[in-house]
Amino acid sequence: MNDNWYKKIIGARTIKTGLATFLTALFCLALNLNPIFAILTAIVTIEPTAKASLKKGYRRLPATIIGALFAVIFTFIFGDQSPFAYALSATFTIILCTKLNLHVGTTVATLTAMAMIPGIHEAYFFNFFSRLLTAIIGLVTAGLVNFIILPPKYYDQVESSINLTESKMYELFELRMRQLLLGKFTKGAPYRQLNQLIDLNQKVETLLSYQKDELSYHKHHDSEWIQLKALTTRAHTNRLFITHLSNLVYLPKDTIITFTNDEKLAILSIAQSINNIYSTGHFERKKQHASLLKMSVKGLDEFDSNQLKSHVIYEILLIYRILDHRFA
C-alpha cells in the first residue's frame, strides 16, 4: 500500500500550517495572550522550504513591529473609533515596509495593525509589547514546525513534471516541423502550446531550487545530491531545447521558405525520431539526414533571401545536437 496516500487528500504544507496554528494558539493561551496576531504570523510563515521560512521570517518580524507601532501611535492620536487611525496606520506601515525592503512582511504587518486598533484602548505599551511577543511566538513556532515536520521532498513531483515537459516538447517539435513543411510559417503557429511548455519548465526549475534549499538545511544522503544533479541537468537541457524551439515557432510575418524534397524528408525523419524519444526511451540518430541538412545550410548565403531558411535549419541541427549529447 502506498505510504503517501494522504498526499492525495491533504498536502504536507497544509498539515504543517494546521499544526503551527494549533501550537501557536496553545502557547499564547497558556501565557494568557491574544493568539490572533501570533496565528496570523504563523500562517504566512509556512513556506515551501525551511530556508524560505527563516529568510522571510527575518523580514516579517521587523515589519510586524512597524505595524504594531503605527497602530499604537495613531490610536493614541485619533482614538480607536476614528477612520483616520485605520487609514494612516495602514498607509504608513506599507510606506515604511516598502522603504526598508520588507515587502514579504507588509501584508501581515498591515493586518496586525488593523486587528490591534480596536483592542488597544489606553494600554498602549502593554499592547505593543504583547503584540511583539505574540509575533515572535508565531514566527518561531511556524519556523520550527516547517523545519522539523515533514521536510518536503520534491523529487517525484519534479520527475513527473520533467517527463510531462519532455513529452509535450517532443510532440510540439514534430508538430511545428510538419507546419513548416506545409508552409504554415506564422498562421496557426502553436504559441499557446509553447507558452504552456515554458511555464511548465519554469515550474520544474522552481521546484528544483526548493529541493536544493532543503538539502542545504537537512541531513541527507549523497545519493540525493546525485539525484538532484541528474534532474537539474535534464531541466537545463529541456530549457535549451525549448529556447531553440521558440526560435522555430516565432518567425517573422510573411515568412516564406522553400525546402527541397530531400530536405523535407530529412526534417520529417528527424522530427519523428525526436517525437519517439518519450515512448522508446532513446534517441534514434538520423546521421544521414542530419548530414544532408548540414550540407544544405553550407550552400546557403545567410545574407540573401535564404537567410530565414538557413536560420530554421540551424535551429533544427542545434536541437538535434542537444539530444545527441544528452543520449550519448
Curated annotation (Swiss-Prot):
Q: Does the keyword rRNA-binding apply?
A: no
| InterPro entries in UniProt | ArAE_1
Query: Where in or outside the cell?
Result: Cell membrane
Domain of life, per the record? Bacteria
Q: Which family does it belong to?
A: Belongs to the UPF0421 family.
Q: Name one GO cellular component term.
A: plasma membrane
What is this protein's name?
Answer: UPF0421 protein SSP0904
Query: Which key words tag this protein in UniProt?
Result: Cell membrane, Membrane, Transmembrane, Transmembrane helix
What organism does the UniProt record list as the source? Staphylococcus saprophyticus subsp. saprophyticus (strain ATCC 15305 / DSM 20229 / NCIMB 8711 / NCTC 7292 / S-41)
| UniProt signal peptide | none
Keyword Transmembrane helix among record annotations: yes
Q: How does it sit in the membrane?
A: Multi-pass membrane protein
Transmembrane ranges, per UniProt, are 26-46, 61-81, 84-104, 132-152
